[in-house]
Amino acid sequence: MRLAMISEHASPLAALGGEDSGGQNVYVAELARRLATMGHRLDVFTRRDSTLLPTVVPFERGVRVVNLPAGPAESVPKDELFPFIAEFRDAFYQFAREVPTAYDLVHANFWMSGWVACEAKRDLGLPFAQTFHALGEIKKREQGAADTSPPERQAAEVRILEEADRVLATCPAEVEELLDLYGADPARLTLVPCGVDVRKFRPVDQSKAHKKLGIPDGPTVVYVGRLVPRKGVDTLIEAFALLPDHLDARLVIVGGEPGVEVSPEVDRLSNLAEKLKVREKVTFTGSQPQKELRLYYGAADVAVTVPHYEPFGMTPLEAMACATPVVGSRVGGIKTSVADGETGYLVPPKDPEALAGRLLRLLSDGALRDRMSRAARRRIKEHYTWEHVAHLATAAFSEVAAGAPRISKTA
């Protein structure tokens, strides 16, 4: 198949770890790679955010990244991009009409990309599949007045659900949300999870990881992810402070803005650790390159991800692929990916006491950690490889393409 993948704010070329970069960037890059290895050809359309970017950038064999104009060629927070989305649409139309071989369908990622896909279905006759990655109703419910989504988001998501030929939900929780909050047509929903590269994220000798990273020996808890309030890192620090002193545990927090050593969130979290008298046991590493993350997961006795809410959650997959047990919030995709009592534990969000209890259990029982480590790696290889995800996505895309009338690319 010839696929047009739209990801307006999350380029596969982007650095990870910033406020608006993370799981979607990984998803788009890895899914595109695996689809290409299956013989599909893809153009990934994203917004040009630098004057140095050419229009077309070869990414992998069979994959090109197409940088389209949409507002200033600089970084813009994703919630401020909608005023430029019509410009993005028009540039997409021009490119799509000029490609030698017409696209079979569009795969839209995030709601603004879905808006473009709705327009392209109407004007170019292109069928489309949608992956939301996050839902506006959930964000509004969880963030309240702090939600910075533009007012057009809700109507756009409703339109997308009415017009999409297929919606790829990443977890059962998202299926429930689409049905209950949006009245989605269940016949057009397909469960396609996110994945992880099990060659990149694989077990590593813990003592070697400690030595290479300069982490002192002893029980180690690791957090990897963005440093924004909804990720619940404050809950983790509060829980860590409840652990008994005799454990002599260390907390390593990996994440932050690329190239930025200090930020308001790091200051807030550091001050909290100081207030709770554990600052000397907490290390903030700042943003780290993807290739280094395996070492941090490998150094951990347990990885923690306890967001207030999370549409899916990629870091639990990465940790489990590295054979590291995970304690995660019972929210979103985490409550499915982490098998409670088997590959780690699930706890309520914003509950430091519950989290501390599970951390103490894992840090105090090496046999339990070993058992969960083996189960974690096994679960990932059975259910969450990118190859598995690509096969599920291809099946959905093929059904969409087979049911679509053939439309001239010049329509």
Regions found by a protein language model. Give the residues of each.
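N-terminal subdomain of nucleotide-sugar transferases
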Residues: 1-65
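Carbohydrate-associated surface elements
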Residues: 173, 195
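A short helix/loop element that forms part of the nucleotide-sugar donor recognition site in Leloir-type
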Residues: 202-215
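A conserved nucleotide-sugar
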Residues: 218-219, 233, 237-283
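Short alpha-helical donor nucleotide-sugar binding micro-motif in glycosyltransferases
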Residues: 287, 295-300
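Aromatic "clamp/platform" in nucleotide-sugar-dependent glycosyltransferases that forms part
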Residues: 308
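Conserved acidic donor-binding segment of nucleotide-sugar-dependent glycosyltransferases
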Residues: 340-341, 345-352, 361-366
